[in-house]
């Protein structure tokens, strides 16, 4: 669970509030030595939506490890889009990029097959309901993701995606998530290119760039994150509709922030944070103090 005290100005208007932001229940275990399952339900999301019956349940899958090299997953899971901000659990993210904020659903029903080259290298093919679908189960996304490690200090979540929107048009995502570690310092660099199949400027005209830095000092984390997103105003079809329905043509967006995290009882139980961030769209300035805690209710071995 995470709760936060916010002090914020948006377009010059002051707002103060204390709110619960995340309350999740995790259930995980094994049906057999080769089949595991996981459920993560978020009580902080609308639990039932006529367009999305399992809206409150982010994760609900079974995973079959068929062999040392192959595994197969069925159920509801994250749409495999590369990038470390997108991949992080929402409870661990204090402020998001516009892409992550605007995408309709990051978790959908589908199936995937993974080939494990080694413990740190896997290639995953996934077909699932589209993250751009407003509850229409006949819209799909086709995803290929590499979870890898190029060097001992360089890990990756890279993906190529073909995603169908409400108008049944496809957009391509090419996303490179990179995680670097050096001693107690960690750096994430995410690069995403988006383009419609008939878009004139396929590269570098509709993008997201994100950088996050963490320096772990004892039970403390010193953190900073910034992002820059843009979509050229010319990225529209002849009828005026946008190729990208998540980041509108003509968008140029900057956000940045920094903060401290403190883990008083080790790094897996309680986390206290103080974070400031701002953005260029709503001229938001937000300072927050908060606490996150995890409790094991039942553990069986």
Regions found by a protein language model. Give the residues of each.
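Outer-membrane beta-barrel pore domains
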Residues: 4-14, 32, 49-50, 61, ...
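Outer membrane beta-barrel
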Residues: 1-6, 13-130, 138, 147-150, ...
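Loop-centered beta-sheet repeat module
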Residues: 122-170
């Amino acid at each position: 669970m995470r709760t936060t005290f916010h002090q914020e100005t948006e377009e010059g208007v002051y707002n103060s509030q204390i709110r619960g932001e995340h309350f999740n229940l995790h259930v995980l275990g094994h049906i057999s030595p080769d089949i595991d399952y996981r459920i993560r339900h978020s009580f902080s999301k609308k639990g039932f939506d006529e367009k999305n019956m399992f809206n409150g349940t982010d994760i609900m899958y079974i995973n079959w490890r068929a062999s040392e090299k192959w595994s197969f997953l069925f159920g509801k899971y994250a749409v495999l889009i590369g990038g470390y901000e997108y991949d992080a659990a929402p409870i661990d993210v204090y402020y998001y990029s516009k892409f992550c904020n605007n995408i309709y659903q990051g978790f959908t029903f589908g199936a995937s097959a993974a080939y494990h080259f080694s413990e740190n290298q896997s290639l995953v093919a996934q077909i699932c309901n589209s993250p751009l679908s407003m509850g229409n189960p006949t819209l799909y996304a086709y995803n290929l993701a590499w979870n890898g490690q190029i060097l001992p200090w360089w890990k990756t979540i890279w993906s190529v995606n073909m995603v169908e929107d409400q108008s049944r048009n496809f957009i391509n995502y090419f996303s490179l998530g990179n995680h670097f570690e050096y001693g107690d310092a960690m750096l994430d660099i995410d690069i995403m290119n988006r383009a419609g199949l008939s878009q004139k400027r396929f590269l570098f005209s509709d993008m997201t760039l994100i950088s996050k830095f963490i320096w772990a000092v004892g039970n403390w984390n010193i953190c900073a994150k910034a992002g820059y997103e843009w979509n050229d105003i010319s990225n529209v079809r002849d009828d005026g509709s946008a190729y990208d329905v998540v980041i509108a043509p003509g968008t140029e967006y900057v956000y940045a922030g920094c903060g401290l995290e403190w883990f008083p009882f080790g790094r897996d139980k309680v986390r206290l944070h103080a974070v400031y961030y701002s953005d260029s769209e709503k001229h938001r300035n937000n300072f927050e103090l908060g606490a996150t805690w995890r409790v094991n209710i039942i553990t069986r071995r």
